[in-house]
Curated annotation (Swiss-Prot):
Coiled coil: none annotated. Belongs to the cytochrome b family. Heme b b566 binds at H97, H196. This is Cytochrome b. A ubiquinone binds at H201. The keyword Phosphoprotein does not apply. One of its GO terms (molecular function) is ubiquinol-cytochrome-c reductase activity. The cytochrome bc1 complex contains 11 subunits: 3 respiratory subunits (MT-CYB, CYC1 and UQCRFS1), 2 core proteins (UQCRC1 and UQCRC2) and 6 low-molecular weight proteins (UQCRH/QCR6, UQCRB/QCR7, UQCRQ/QCR8, UQCR10/QCR9, UQCR11/QCR10 and a cleavage product of UQCRFS1). This cytochrome bc1 complex then forms a dimer. Binds 2 heme b groups non-covalently. It holds the Pfam family Cytochrom_B_C.
Length: 381
């Protein structure tokens, strides 16, 4: 009998990607996050689809349509809570996935890495436009503040902002187009994920040691399918705990009030997963400078392959680089905390110090550590 799995045109692609894929035998649980992100994307698309059936993108009815979903639609509260907290899980997995890539030198697969950075930016854009849709106070003011940043672009800034708004302020036209963007972007993300996987499977996975894994590879199924299912179980458990017991813990209380253009909240802040970038933006007194720093905080990932000076790929055997990596992690946690605090001392100076340190570690200290570790590899006799 002909094995369909290996001969059927469609099954063959699936087989080469998820079943007979030769995988390094030593990859750890840090390699679980790719599949977890895929599951997060599926959850977000499915819950989002059901929410969009009941949501109306009109300034007069958007807020009440979300209330209607939670009160009157069968399990609407659950779908909404899964979608809102699913976004948080998505970003938790994303940050861990990127962190893994930095620690183990996965960025040296340049095409895969660059597509990954584009994916990160697209997911951030999707989350931003999605946050505006419930039309609560923080949704409205968050949209106003963040879109207004584009006015810092010389000459075309103001025109560009009004073009995005569809008027002279965030209003019905803005909400309608943001809903359209929020609906289409996940499908663009799905297409980018396929390209990401395509480039990854051209080279094969990296591994913790950072050395050529071709000497010892095992089939993806059953070894890593079982391993991924364990990670998936933990993530689903965490998501359900969040959605069922603490659905609003990561949200903003201001979003329980309908959007009011006449009443500004005392402290405007985005969702937790944007706070690190928001803190970098606020730490620069100049508007255009802040916008450039905000973009640089993400786009800096694109230059990482060119800043790699070490003879070793992974940080597994590089103690100085490891120390800097964990300093960078602590630094990002500090920036996230600062982004949620009001603009007053001592938060301003802490934010500025953390912002400088962020760029200093990536652009200067890590490449220097790589060179120093190379020198330490040389025999002393």
């Amino acid at each position: 009998m002909i094995n369909l799995r290996k001969t059927h045109p469609l099954m063959k692609i699936i087989n080469h990607s998820f079943i007979d894929l030769p995988t390094p035998s030593n990859i750890s649980a840090w390699w679980n996050f790719g599949s977890l992100l895929g599951v997060c994307l599926i959850i977000q698309i499915l819950t989002g689809l059901f929410l969009s059936m009941h949501y109306t993108s009109d300034t007069l009815t958007a807020f009440s349509s979300v209330v209607h979903i939670c009160r009157d639609v069968n399990y609407g509260w659950l779908i909404r809570n899964l979608h809102a907290n699913g976004a948080s899980m998505f970003f938790m997995c994303l940050f861990l996935h990127v962190g893994r890539g930095i620690y183990y030198g996965s960025y040296l697969y340049k095409e895969t890495w660059n597509i990954g950075v584009i994916l990160l930016l697209t997911v951030m854009a999707t989350a931003f436009v999605g946050y505006v849709l419930p039309w609560g106070q923080m949704s409205f003011w968050g949209a106003t503040v963040i879109t207004n940043l584009l006015s810092a672009i010389p000459y075309i800034g103001t025109t560009l902002v009004e073009w995005i708004w569809g008027g002279f302020s965030v209003d019905k036209a803005t909400l309608t187009r943001f809903f359209a963007f929020h609906f289409i972007l996940p499908f663009i993300i799905t297409a980018l994920v396929i390209v990401h996987l395509l480039f990854l499977h051209e080279t094969g996975s990296n591994n913790p040691s950072g050395i050529d894994p071709n000497a010892d590879k095992i089939p993806f199924h059953p070894y890593y399918t079982i391993k991924d299912i364990m990670g998936l179980t933990i993530m689903i458990l965490a998501l359900l705990t969040l959605a069922l017991f603490h659905p609003d813990v990561l949200g903003d209380p201001d979003n329980f009030s309908p959007a009011n253009p006449l009443n500004t909240p005392p402290h405007i802040k985005p969702e937790w997963y944007f706070l690190f970038a928001y803190a970098i933006l606020r730490s620069i007194p100049n508007k255009l400078g802040g916008v450039i720093a905000l973009l640089a905080s993400i786009l800096i990932l694109l230059v990482m392959p060119f800043l790699h000076t070490s003879k070793q790929r992974s940080m597994m055997f590089r103690p100085i680089s490891q120390t800097l990596f964990w300093l960078l992690t602590a630094n990002l946690a500090t920036l996230t905390w600062i982004g949620g605090q009001p603009v007053e001392e001592p938060y301003i100076i802490i934010g500025q110090a953390a912002s400088i340190t962020y760029f200093l570690i990536i652009l200067v200290l890590m490449p220097m550590a790589g060179l120093l570790e190379n020198h330490m590899l040389k025999p002393k006799w």
